[in-house]
A protein has these predicted regions:
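Cysteine-centered catalytic environments shared across enzyme families
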Residues: 1-133
Length: 133
């Protein structure tokens, strides 16, 4: 991941395939990056506790870092934990599949989609290519 980021910057996501969830910190740009694979196979959660951005593969990793779990009843009832960036816990969000988030030195968090199901495939083919004989 580091080599891809050094070569392509945030365009690195065009070159990634497979399962992943990772975090990078660009010291020069003072930019934190957290990313998740296209299909969301690998989990990645985040929250802000005591003025700090916390990111982990499991929400329980936040427990020793001043995070107090509280059920998000609305998310549970609406199924938001399954269909959007909400989780079962208040103020804990998911990095969505096919997305990455950035956080600058001022704590500004931005979300970016690098892939979705409508993303054009590099290998194009037609129905006739699959038709027999």
């Amino acid at each position: 991941m580091l080599a891809l980021y050094q070569a392509y910057g945030l365009d690195m996501f065009k070159h990634l395939r497979g399962e992943f969830a990772f975090c990078l910190y660009d010291e020069e740009k003072e930019l934190f990056i957290a990313a998740r694979d296209r299909y969301g196979i690998k989990p990645l959660f985040y929250t802000v506790a005591s003025g700090r951005l916390l990111v982990a593969a499991e929400a329980k990793a936040f427990l020793p870092l001043d995070w107090q779990p509280e059920w998000d009843v609305k998310s549970l009832v609406e199924g938001g934990w399954n269909f959007d960036d909400r989780t079962m816990f208040k103020d804990v969000k998911k990095v969505r599949p096919g997305c990455y988030m950035t956080c600058d030195k001022d704590g500004n968090i931005e979300h970016h989609r690098y892939w979705d199901i409508d993303y054009p495939d590099k290998a194009s083919c037609s129905f006739l290519g699959f038709a027999p004989g």
